[in-house]
Amino acid sequence: SRTGKQFMNVKHIENELQPLFSDYPNLILDGELYNHALKNDFEKIISLVRKQKPTNDDRSEAASLVQFHWYDIIDDDNDILFIDRCKFIHELIADYIPHPAVPVLSVVTLPVGSLDKARAIHDANLAGGFEGSIIRLNKVYECKRSYNLQKFKDFSDKEATIIGHVEGKGKRAGTLGKFIMR
């Protein structure tokens, strides 16, 4: 995780990346555990990934659903610009992840030269069911919130009436989990 916590139920991803880390032991990947087929049930991914003592069934389900979407690397010297990091990622994927049916995917990265082009790509992302886009400047990686990486999202406000609630699950039991709204 980004806080250094080990996930116990992503062995299928670890196994796929093991040859890469054998050759590049100091490489740090930036990405997220995701599956676009579960875009409306992100809690499913979270519940699978956070299991501390996964059963064989949990491992099997995670292997069929949880993917690593890889979008950047953190280099040792932190002096490589984003466009060069992207090229390196594509080289690594070609060398180490040669078959497309594996749980490690490179996130599509496209250069844009104008707000209109960024808007067109963003609109295509929304039409594809994604929640937004990320705009990265061609700068070195910063391990913090940065102007060099901006979310591009559309927002809409709606009014709703709270008609109920659902109790939290697991360690959140006994607390408010979510509201039911109309």
Could you tell me what each predicted segment is?
Residues 1-4, 58-65, 76, 90, ...:
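Nucleic-acid 5′ end/cap handling module spanning
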Residues 1-99:
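Covalent nucleotidyltransferase
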